[in-house]
Amino acid sequence: MTHATEDVVGAEGSADERARQVEQQMTDEERFSLVISIFGWAPRMFPTKDPRIPDGTNMSAGYTPGVPRLGIPAIQSSDASMGVTNPGYRPDDPGATAFPSLIALGSSFNPSLVREGGEAIGREARSRGFNVQLAGGCNLARDPRNGRNFEYYSEDPYLSAVLAAEQVNGIQSQGVTSTLKHFSLNCNETNRHWLDARIDPDAHREADLLAFQIAIERSHPGAIMSGYNKINGEYAGGNGHLLNDVLKGAWGYPGYVMSDWGATLSWDFALKGLDQESGVQGDMVFWGKEPFTDDLRQAYADGKLPEERLHDMVLRILRSLFAVGADQWGPAPEVDLDRYHAIALQGARQGIVLLKNDGALPLAADQPLKVALIGGFAQEGVASGTGSGAVNPVGGFADVVPIGGAGIMGGSRNLFLFRPSPLELLKKALPQAKLDFDPGYTPAEAAMTAKRNDVVVAFAVRVEGEGYDNADLSLPWGQDAMIDAVAAANPNTIVVLETGNPTSMPWRDKVQAIVQAWYPGQAGAQAIAEILTGAVNPSGRLPITFPESLDQTPRPQLPGHGTPWGTAVTIDYNEGAEIGYRWMAKTGAQPMYAFGHGLSYTSFEYSDLTVTGGETVTAMFTVTNTGDRAGGDVPQLYLTDAAGEKRMRLLGFERVELEPGQSRQVTLTADPRLLARYDGTASQWRVAAGTHRVALARAANDEQASAEVELTGYLFGS
């Protein structure tokens, strides 16, 4: 893929100098125009186009006028992390590549693949005139009910950081600024505008903030988007400690902080570190004003907003545009939709996780099987998540099923289905088989279909998305009962799940195989068919823990769920940094399926583990494919004990592709912060001196080898 801006990307010194030179020539009126963005015309939310957007402007998620006399381009942004979206306000848009959900890409454990997807998204964004992509979902999947988990990579800070950074790197390589979002603790959707997320500050640094810190260091995103929620009583967009002291102070972040749409409550958020109010009409809807328009100007006139702060806000925005070369664009680049589809297909293939297989898979493509396909809209397409990140694919959706709901996001809550359908692709993949389809609307009819066939593939979907959390982990619309009835009628049942989160699976012991397909994007049906028939060997690994029940989680009951829209909610994240697999290790609970779990049609063996210490841990080992098929594996290195303290941390991983009998040596070196505790009194990280135990594992609860190593005690970083 052509990197059109290699001469300017990363040229931070020249970007800083140019920003200073240009900013000095701006008028205050031009400066104020740069610190807001105007939500593009969306008929579902705003019936008329905002008059501040010039006629002929390509409508976008956010528009900020440029300053042509100084070479400053207009800023036009688009959602999001799974492709360039079109949420209802570009009727002539041809559609874009719909990549797999981020949690599916998280299951790939493949940074280079995520980078390729980011490059494609950046190029498609640029071809449409968007120079800011609202991508880089870096929140941690703390709660398996969070409706937006499909927009995030994982529950682990390190895995999330590495993958989010590569998406940002890919996007920005195309001359498009990328965000990293949502800073921070935007981990539940229930009444998110009124949610106060409470957490111990040191634990926050070791988990959610560490994910952002590592991702920023690895990718230098042009913008950080704040969340809707409060953190310890202060709104994310006006949290001076997090924005000024941590992000811009301790970490030295040089880019700009934008609010989420409708998340700026007051002009004084500018004093607390917010540089741009995004989607100003959203603030008018929620709070009855646009704080960075009249209020900010008045504060400046009254001397409450210092001149140097206004200059700093503008400098940060200019610097980010210039750093990627967004001011030097030539003609719109050509896009290669076939190549992008191939990237999306590879993401779906590597993101699908085989959770269980009692010999039912792969299906024999050359056998005259009678196969029942039941449920999950498998005759129409594969499911996608909802909200601002939903991508309108080239050629449009196979179907859009309205769901609705309370609150401002109710109108965009739909079941989106991408063509082609699993039914169509499985017919091609099983040319000797006779396929028998039932929609799965009633358990009795589904059971009759199951009984008259050799094997059953039952599909199940769940609608999840922005603005809503799930009440529990069950499947909607009676699908658990349907699967239970089908499995009772024909034990040779395979279940394919298209969801954005773990599910409860009360029928788990009654079926022969379970495939977690997530929301697999526009190429999902092909990937599912290839996995089921063995054309592709499954290699995905879970980036989120699947609990046996919500009783194993820190909050069996979700605070505020079911309360009216607009209700103030407080969530105490008392688990601190012990999220997901870390919580399971701390409590001794055994999950249904552990973080890192995933089966294959081949087998792998680990050997020759050697570990060295000092200031960090370096592990070397050999991975061998001991089976008869080529396949991908993801060996994982964990800290399990730190100088006598039981502590579970993913230290590293590497995806390896091996032919039968092939071996490869892997070396993993841990970021020292993963071995440390954050010491808030010293404002530094502290590694404890002494013996540390590390484990080489297939999953968080599946150790294959372990070793002890001595580490030097020391303070470092910030």
Where are these regions (language model features)?
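Glycoside hydrolase catalytic-domain context in secreted enzymes
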Residues: 1-678, 684-701, 708, 715-718
